[in-house]
């Protein structure tokens, strides 16, 4: 029986200045009983992975609306591997074309959500995915 709350880092990498979506996700995850660490705006991949390591999170949620996902996500995934944190579940939310989403999944991203995705679906995906890896 695991009574530990799921710990999620919600991050806004890159120069994107819109954080409303990330805050909505963070609130939904908190309301679902998860512990959420929100890093704020303009985070580098290094800052995100270091925060994930320090906070001992099981999940990283990246909110990227700037179109920089093809530059940012591969770097985050490489840093996680470098720090032997490949067991951390990575999800991406934002404006990501289908072909890019497929490439991100090949890099190890667990799921990619478009704007308007169901908060309930995101919560359920995290719960079921973290249970499988716990």
Regions found by a protein language model. Name each.
Residues 1-6:
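Non-catalytic signal-transmission and effector/linker regions of two-component phosphorelay proteins
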Residues 22-127, 132:
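Cofactor-cradling patches in redox/metallo enzymes
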Residues 14:
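A glycine- and charged-residue-rich anion-binding loop/surface
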Residues 9-11:
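Short hydrophobic segments within beta-strands
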């Amino acid at each position: 029986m695991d009574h530990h709350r799921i710990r999620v880092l919600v991050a806004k990498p890159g120069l994107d200045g819109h954080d409303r979506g990330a805050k909505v996700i963070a609130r939904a995850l908190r309301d679902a009983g998860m512990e959420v660490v929100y890093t704020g705006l303009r985070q580098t991949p290094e800052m995100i992975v270091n925060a994930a390591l320090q906070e001992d999170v099981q999940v990283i949620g990246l909110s990227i609306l700037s179109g920089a996902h093809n530059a940012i996500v591969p770097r985050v995934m490489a840093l996680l591997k470098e720090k032997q944190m490949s067991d951390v579940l990575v999800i991406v939310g934002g404006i990501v074309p289908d072909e890019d989403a497929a490439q991100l999944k090949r890099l190890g991203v667990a799921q990619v959500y478009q704007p308007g995705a169901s908060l309930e679906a995101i919560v359920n995906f995290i719960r079921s995915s973290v249970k499988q890896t716990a």
